[in-house]
Amino acid sequence: MAMKSVAVLTKGMFGRIPAQLAVSSVPSNTIQKRSNYKFVGMPNETDGTLAGDLNYGLHNVFFTELFRGFGVMLGHVFMEPATINYPFEKGPLSSRFRGEHALRRYPSGEERCIACKLCEAICPAQAITIEAETRPDGSRRTTRYDIDMTKCIYCGLCQEACPVDAIVEGPNFEYSTETHEELLYNKEKLLLNGDRWEPELASNLQAEYLYR
């Protein structure tokens, strides 16, 4: 009964019972003074005083929240938009952006990958599979380089581990597919990505060389 009487005080000017009745039903040591509370901004309920009741009633009668929100809306009409019209407009990407994978070549056209398999070993998702063979000149090159893009978590560890900057994550993030098989990248697909994005890849690596 004591809790119910105190709660009635918060219902506003139209639902309150006389204060003396509520106080009489509650022990004096359980009553907290209204001065202990501070209403900030737009009040959602009355604070129990006559001024609070009047303020609460005016806000409900004249819909001040509605007009205040309308004013905020009008202010944003003349502000610069915070969004872009994607996909017709695209925002800038960081040089550290990690997108679709690619295998790079040297300017001579020779593949950079030396089949050290460091990327395969460090991949936490075990998404990379590499097979290699030794050439007559003693160098090693990959015969198979597969990445299961459905497993990849885009951590960038493969790129960090590569000693010759062969495997990188490029700027492309628009490569959604309709089938699972299209996300199983082989060596030819990765080299094609590298040829396509080489200018951007080289520029990004150069921009970040001090931090690698």
UniProtKB/Swiss-Prot annotation:
Q: Where does [4Fe-4S] cluster 2 bind?
A: C123, C152, C155, C158
One Pfam family name is Fer4_7
Provide the protein's localization: Mitochondrion
| Domain of life, source organism | Eukaryota
What is the protein's name according to its record?
Probable NADH dehydrogenase [ubiquinone] iron-sulfur protein 8, mitochondrial
Q: Which species expresses this protein natively? A: Caenorhabditis elegans
Cofactors required:
[4Fe-4S] cluster
Q: Which GO terms describe its molecular function?
A: 4 iron, 4 sulfur cluster binding; metal ion binding; NADH dehydrogenase (ubiquinone) activity
Q: Which UniProt keywords apply?
A: 4Fe-4S, Electron transport, Iron, Iron-sulfur, Metal-binding, Mitochondrion, NAD, Oxidoreductase, Repeat, Respiratory chain, Transit peptide, Translocase, Transport, Ubiquinone
The primary gene name is ndus-8
Q: How is the cofactor bound?
A: Binds 2 [4Fe-4S] cluster.
Show the NCBIfam families listed in the entry.
Answer: NuoI (TIGR01971), PRK05888.1-4 (NF004538), PRK05888.1-5 (NF004539)
What's the main place this protein lives? Answer: mitochondrion
**Among the entry's GO cellular component annotations, what is one?**
mitochondrion
> Where is [4Fe-4S] cluster 1 bound in this sequence?
C113, C116, C119, C162
How is the quaternary structure described?
Answer: Complex I is composed of 45 different subunits This is a component of the iron-sulfur (IP) fragment of the enzyme.
Sum up the protein's function in the record's words: Core subunit of the mitochondrial membrane respiratory chain NADH dehydrogenase (Complex I) that is believed to belong to the minimal assembly required for catalysis. Complex I functions in the transfer of electrons from NADH to the respiratory chain. The immediate electron acceptor for the enzyme is believed to be ubiquinone.
Question: Locate the 4Fe-4S ferredoxin-type domain: which residues?
Answer: 104-133, 143-172
Does the UniProt entry include the keyword Phosphoprotein?
A: no
